[in-house]
From Swiss-Prot:
It comes from the Viruses. The record marks K195, K198, K199 as: Important for efficient shutoff activity and nuclear localization. GO terms for molecular function: RNA binding. Belongs to the influenza viruses PA-X family. Keywords: Decay of host mRNAs by virus, Eukaryotic host gene expression shutoff by virus, Host cytoplasm, Host gene expression shutoff by virus, Host mRNA suppression by virus, Host nucleus, Host-virus interaction. It comes from Influenza A virus (strain A/Leningrad/134/1957 H2N2). It is found in: Host cytoplasm; Host nucleus. The active site is at E80, D108. The record marks L28, L65, K202, K203, K206 as: Important for efficient shutoff activity. The probable endonuclease active site in the N-terminus and the basic amino acid cluster in the C-terminus are important for the shutoff activity. The C-terminus acts as a nuclear localization signal. The C-terminus is recruited to host protein complexes involved in nuclear Pol II RNA processing. The lineage of its organism: Viruses, Riboviria, Orthornavirae, Negarnaviricota, Polyploviricotina. Plays a major role in the shutoff of the host protein expression by cleaving mRNAs probably via an endonuclease activity. This host shutoff allows the virus to escape from the host antiviral response. Hijacks host RNA splicing machinery to selectively target host RNAs containing introns for destruction. This may explain the preferential degradation of RNAs that have undergone co- or post-transcriptional processing. Transmembrane segments: none annotated. This is Protein PA-X. Its main location: host cell.
Amino acid sequence: MEEFVRQCFNPMIVELAEKAMKEYGEDLKIETNKFAAICTHLEVCFMYSDFHFINEQGESIIVELDDPNALLKHRFEIIEGRDRTMAWTVVNSICNTTGAEKPKFLPDLYDYKENRFIEIGVTRREVHIYYLEKANKIKSEKTHIHIFSFTGEEMATKADYTLDEESRARIKTRLFTIRQEMASRGLWDSFVSPKEAKKQLKKDLKSQGQCAGSPTKVSRRTSPALRILEPMWMDSNPTATLRASFLKCPKK
């Protein structure tokens, strides 16, 4: 799984995921599924923000090519991917500037057009189940929730999907590709099943020549900074210049 992640995600995304896991004492060599899920969530957040700007008239526009003469502001502020201290500094600054209500939990993005924080979720389960879990945790109507699945489904607060259909389709296609690439390498089942994950971990440790006494238990602890995890796997926390370039997964 670790090799797959390093091949299939932008190096900047991988680096951010490594820093997040290191900050909370998590070993990516052991918790490889979490490593993959953090990278997936980061990429979705960056794709959500990509190409969306606000022009001089305050209108939301999509620009895929940089125009040095255009006075444009990024529509979305990316909060996900920052260390906790910096992330809260950004959130506080946004609240002071816009008058937005400070969220209880760190969100993933801020939408300057709709003036709201956004929580992004990526799940392999039924989207409505994960949405309800997320809403129950956040307990705030001020934070907009948008959930994507690896099967192409999505769910958002009040059916307001924020982005245009084409932008959302890019995200869904990327998630489907990740799923297919994992499956082709025999990694998908272990990514979504705790039992299969343990088997895969034991197999990986054995292939790495580690001793029989090496730890094989997969941690179920959820890092505070990586709250958008489902109960076992990561679903989901920099600047405007850190936009992901999306690499196709090379075949074996």
